[in-house]
Amino acid sequence: MKVARTPHFLRNFSDLPTVVQKKFYKQLAYLLTDIRHPSLRAKKYDENAGIWQARVDNDFRFYFQIVDDTYLILSIIKHPK
């Protein structure tokens, strides 16, 4: 699988603390090897739009779509508690 990032994601990502960015890259590596990796807790977020949610850590989630052989990373946001 390949990875593509939206401009929206890139804007949000650049504003995040470095520690969160590093955690995201670790989680992205898990996603590329196994979408069912327990650390990701990946699940369908919006069935109609084909949007998935996965965990960065306790505080952040990232959202993506699967388009052909590409994970399109849509956004990364603080998880509301």
Model-found features: residue ranges?
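Solvent-exposed, charged interface segments at domain starts and junctions
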Residues: 1-2, 38
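Short, surface-exposed linear patches
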Residues: 25-27, 45-47, 75-78
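N-terminal first-folded block
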Residues: 8-38
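A periodicity- and composition-biased signal for non-globular, repetitive helical segments
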Residues: 11, 27, 33, 49-50, ...
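Enriched for short, Lys/Arg-rich terminal
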Residues: 2-7, 11, 18-22, 55-61, ...
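A short, surface-exposed loop/turn module that caps and links secondary-structure elements
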Residues: 29-54
